[in-house]
Amino acid sequence: MAVEKFETALKKLEDVVNRLESGELSLDDSLKAFEEGVKMAAFCTKKLDEAEKKVEILLKKKDGSFAKEPFRLEDD
């Protein structure tokens, strides 16, 4: 896939959604747009997963020093 940046893929995904929601595409064009949207969504999800793995929280200990810990989402 030629897309290198999350922001670029997200913009393309938004454009696809807008075209699909317009109701002006033929069935064939709608299917092509849908396929493109699925690819962009998968790319964005992959990039977000990669970013989440890199995020760390810097926590202050009682003695005043800091410790890095992996970021974890709380279960709802």
Swiss-Prot record:
Gene coding for it: xseB
Catalytic activity: Exonucleolytic cleavage in either 5'- to 3'- or 3'- to 5'-direction to yield nucleoside 5'-phosphates
UniProt cross-references to InterPro entries, sorted A to Z: Exonuc_VII_S, Exonuc_VII_ssu_sf
Assembly with partners or alone: Heterooligomer composed of large and small subunits.
GO biological process: DNA catabolic process
Protein name: Exodeoxyribonuclease 7 small subunit
UniProt keyword list: Cytoplasm, Exonuclease, Hydrolase, Nuclease
Database matches in PANTHER family: EXODEOXYRIBONUCLEASE 7 SMALL SUBUNIT
Hydrolase among keywords: yes
